[in-house]
């Protein structure tokens, strides 16, 4: 589910809805910020030409089951704008070099995104899957920016990593706001 805030007066209600398990927040008004927290999952920020935006939390389930796609579709509905005009920013996440998964998860990635999402039969590339998914929905590849930073490779230095810490760690955040000036 995507929590949607269409006016500043709805912030408390949107926050409450998001806290019940939303994987994304879409903001369609000025003066409202969104913050989602991450460890190894991919933060995704989608921005429409109007300045309306969505922030999505994309762990492997969020990638495979389409939290990013639901956020994009919600933003398209909110703005009336087509996806080819949107910009997508993918923040730091666990890269394939450290993201070894079971056969069932690898199959789900392959079935959803094809060969590009797998480095080998046990290592998943969430960034490639996200880029492929956004492109399949009409977002131009040149409008998709991936910071290409691994949370495990930089654990403790720049980022928190659930996997690198053995399950005990802090979180880093993806913050988005529309500032008028």
Predicted regions and their residues:
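Active-site microenvironment for binding and transforming phosphate-containing groups
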Residues: 1-181
